[in-house]
Amino acid sequence: QIFFFFSSTSEPVTPVTAAPQEAHGQRLEHFPVALLSSVMGVSGLTLAWLKAHAVLGAPIIVGEGLRGVASALFGLLLLFYGLKALRYPEAVKLEIRHPIKVNFVPTVSISLLLLAVCYLEAAPELAYWLWGAGAVLHFGLTLAIFGSWIHHSHYAIQHANPAWFIPVVGNIIVPVAGIRFASPELSWFFFSIGLVFWIVLLTIVLYRLIFHEPLPARLAPTLFILLAPPSVGFIAYVNMTGTVDGFARVLYYTALFLALLLASNAIRFLRLPFFISAWAYSFPLAALTLATLVMSAHVPGSFFRPLGMGLLALLSLVVAVLAARTLVAVWRRDLCKPD
């Protein structure tokens, strides 16, 4: 099977019979890189609340507190994955060679880029180094993953799913802070990569969804990733141009339509059991929330302000539920299981 790497709390818990040290080692070996998508979700929530402070007058302490949580979460998860890489390098190599898992490896570089935006005003120097490290790492990962797509021997159309957008989205995130730290041409370079290949991959993914079997339940939450490229693209474009023009509106309303399409299938998503892949709900929803708040700032007296408030409330609820369900899964030892 191609979708087995997301653990679920709906599965029965296997009694632990191994020695404690051996059990801990096994869990570390199977620590999923996809768990770093939770950092993207919390960072996105942070940015939404920080923007809400500027646009809606929301308490700044909420955004600042979430920024600390996102930073600590990234450090903790990166530590665990680093230990996994040192102790079980073959397990990491298997993830990199996996046709689906490999798309979650860039969550590391994307987390750095998002944290850079989180610290953009509070600690510009720290934000610069986070952005630089994230941009360089993500560009390298983009070349590696795109190269594997071209010179592959193990990909099939069934492997195509919205998670393939993750490497693309990172390139669109680079200009959000990059326009402050480097030449505008560099920001346009990354933006162009992300936007063009988003359209290419969107065609492939839609073909797979329409003409082949539906996504398995464990990958169904990744459909929300469809929201991310146009939402982040809108934010990056407005940051680079300083205006909401016709093209910016095309990006935003594309994201809004996709959100309405997903909302019309809300019952299906609510009926799904919890998987780690459910964190795919968080960052795309955060990106749409942030984009809506940006629209509210540029188009005053419109419905974007109440829409942004509603999306912020929904996003906060979604992240809180995901965090609670993840902690329950950790308590029950349902995470980090063998495939």
Task: Describe these PLM feature segments.
Residues 144-145, 176-177, 200-209, 232-239, ...:
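Alpha-helical transmembrane segments in multipass membrane proteins, preferentially the mid-helix core
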Residues 65-76, 126-139, 187-198, 247-257, ...:
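Structural signature of hydrophobic alpha-helical transmembrane segments
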Residues 113-150:
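A generic, well-ordered mixed alpha/beta core segment in the N-terminal half of proteins
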